[in-house]
UniProtKB/Swiss-Prot annotation:
This is A-type ATP synthase subunit F. It is found in: Cell membrane. Component of the A-type ATP synthase that produces ATP from ADP in the presence of a proton gradient across the membrane. It is a peripheral membrane protein. It comes from the Archaea. Belongs to the V-ATPase F subunit family. It comes from Thermococcus gammatolerans (strain DSM 15229 / JCM 11827 / EJ3).
Length: 102
C-alpha cells in the first residue's frame, strides 16, 4: 500500500525531500482547488493507496469523502494545526474505538 500526500507547495516539498513518492502540490486559486478535488477522488478510487495525508487547510477547501479505506488523515501545514483538543480526541476515538481522557 502506498501513502499519498496532498497539500501546499511547502508541505509537498518537505514530503518529497523525506522520500514520499505520491506527492501532489496545490495552490489556493479556485482552479487549483478543483484540481485538488479531482485528485482526491482519483486517489480514493485507487486500490494501491492505503493512506492519504492532506493538509488541514486544503481539507477545509475540498470535499473530503467519508470512506473507511483508504484512511484520510488531515495534517498541519506551515501555519500550524487548526484542530482543537476535542476534535483530535474524536478523531482518535473513531480511529481506534477508544475515548482518551485526561
Amino acid at each position: 500500500m502506498k501513502i499519498a500526500v496532498m497539500g501546499d507547495p511547502d508541505t509537498a516539498l518537505g514530503f518529497k525531500l523525506a522520500g514520499a513518492h505520491e506527492v501532489y502540490s496545490f495552490g489556493s486559486s479556485p482552479l487549483e482547488i478543483e484540481r485538488a478535488n479531482n485528485k482526491l477522488k482519483e486517489l480514493v478510487e485507487r486500490d494501491d493507496i492505503g493512506i492519504i495525508l492532506i493538509t488541514e487547510t486544503l481539507a477545509q477547501r475540498v470535499e473530503v469523502p467519508e470512506v473507511e479505506f483508504p484512511i484520510i488523515l488531515q495534517i498541519p501545514d506551515k501555519s500550524g494545526s487548526r484542530f482543537g483538543e476535542a476534535q483530535l480526541r474524536e478523531i482518535v476515538r473513531r480511529a481506534i474505538g477508544v475515548e482518551l481522557k485526561r
